[in-house]
């Protein structure tokens, strides 16, 4: 507010994409008397509500199609199989939204820590919704806005390669112009304010080179190699992550000629669990989008509820060293847990299926 609000964007005081700074500027106009810390936390809470809206949309759409408990099942063969362990269909979207808002890491991330990880996670959830339900261009807009908020949105991007190669997917190569156009559009206000274009375009490269540690409290495999050579293991981690990602893309394309919405969520979750586990230089908050996706998937397929709970617990445990100054659960143990959860999700997605109607995969009843 002391720097003429909008034109503060020309200053070099942030090392991330300016999209979040736009929200701070907007808040300074809407609530000029609000303190800085309150403004930051209130933005996080608003983004939490937006995330709750999108999980409500996801689950509500699934209820309307009445096909959430069996991937690939015909809607005419699915009946309401609610039980005491599963909330009634009509109330499930609202329960999903409230559950997200009351998740411990969601509360800590926004209201306590003042972070905005729900912003990119909500955008990813919205983007996947568009890709699932016949609006691929809007889906790409959502994913790109997620990337414009936080680089962690890139964990979901391998899924785009799968969709592009699937013969029955609604995503086409001709849709990809949406990504650069949307991303560049998020930079225009800062450029108009006087921020150099080169600085804006290279922000994530500078961010990547900010830290020279293999892990920053992330429950990744590097917790087991505390004395490893930074340069060698960074290169090895990048190579391993890229190789395994390409292999998984290949297997998914061979396995599915298109995804049902729950399968798309599961594949996105798989990448959001795997990449923070394998990549070097990951932070403690980088499982946030995996938590959101896991919770959403759990309301489609209740058998994934243990996955959602485990993901939240692992993520919450990784917050402790920074917020409390000590480990509540050893990070090495959390790294093992994340590996088990991630491998389990991928094993379920790529496991044996009936050769009858192969691409309309029939999974066991949830």
Feature annotation, model-predicted:
Residues 200-219, 250, 268-269, 297, ...:
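Transmembrane helical bundles and short interhelical boundary loops of multi-pass, membrane-embedded
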Residues 54, 119-136, 293-294:
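Specific aromatic-rich, kink-prone transmembrane helix
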Residues 1-22, 26-31, 195-203:
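Extracytosolic helix-loop segments that constitute the early lumenal/periplasmic catalytic or substrate-binding loops
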Residues 203, 207-278:
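Aromatic/glycine/proline-enriched transmembrane-helix motif characteristic
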Residues 156-181, 192, 289:
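Perimembrane helix-loop-helix junctions
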Residues 75, 92-129, 140-152, 179, ...:
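Membrane-embedded helix bundles of polyisoprenyl
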Residues 42-66, 75-78, 243-254:
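Transmembrane-helix motifs of polytopic, lipid-linked glycan transferases
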Residues 18, 22, 33-53, 230-241:
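Loop-to-helix entry region of an early transmembrane alpha helix in multi-pass inner-membrane enzymes
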């Amino acid at each position: 507010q002391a720097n003429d609000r909008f034109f503060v964007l020309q200053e070099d005081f942030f090392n991330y994409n300016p999209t979040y700074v736009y929200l701070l500027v907007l808040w300074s106009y809407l609530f000029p008397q609000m303190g800085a810390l309150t403004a930051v936390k209130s933005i996080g809470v608003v983004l939490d509500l937006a995330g709750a809206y999108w999980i409500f949309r996801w689950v509500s759409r699934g209820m309307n199609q009445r096909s959430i408990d069996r991937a690939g099942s015909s809607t005419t063969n699915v009946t309401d199989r609610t039980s005491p362990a599963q909330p009634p269909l009509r109330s499930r979207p609202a329960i999903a939204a409230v559950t997200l808002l009351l998740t411990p890491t969601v509360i800590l991330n926004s209201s306590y820590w003042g972070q905005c990880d729900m912003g990119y996670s909500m955008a990813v959830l919205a983007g996947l919704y568009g890709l699932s339900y016949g609006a691929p261009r809007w889906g790409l807009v959502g994913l790109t806005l997620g990337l414009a908020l936080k680089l962690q949105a890139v964990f979901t991007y391998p899924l785009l390669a799968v969709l592009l190669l699937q013969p029955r997917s609604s995503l086409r190569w001709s849709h990809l112009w949406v990504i650069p156009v949307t991303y560049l559009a998020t930079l225009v206000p800062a450029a108009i304010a006087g921020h150099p274009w080169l600085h804006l375009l290279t922000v994530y490269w500078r961010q990547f080179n900010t830290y020279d540690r293999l892990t920053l409290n992330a429950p990744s495999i590097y917790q087991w190699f505390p004395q490893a050579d930074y340069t060698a293991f960074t290169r090895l981690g990048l190579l391993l992550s890229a190789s395994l990602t390409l292999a998984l893309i290949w297997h998914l394309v061979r396995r599915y000629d298109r995804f049902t919405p729950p399968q798309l969520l599961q594949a996105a979750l798989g990448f959001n669990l795997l990449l923070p586990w394998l990549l070097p230089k990951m932070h403690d908050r980088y499982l946030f989008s995996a938590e959101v996706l896991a919770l959403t998937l759990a309301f489609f397929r209740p058998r994934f509820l243990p996955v959602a709970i485990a993901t939240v617990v692992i993520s919450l445990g990784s917050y402790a060293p920074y917020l409390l100054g000590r480990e509540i659960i050893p990070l090495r143990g959390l790294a093992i847990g994340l590996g088990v959860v991630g491998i389990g999700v991928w094993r379920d997605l790529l496991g044996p299926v009936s050769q009858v109607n192969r691409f309309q995969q029939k999974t066991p009843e949830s």
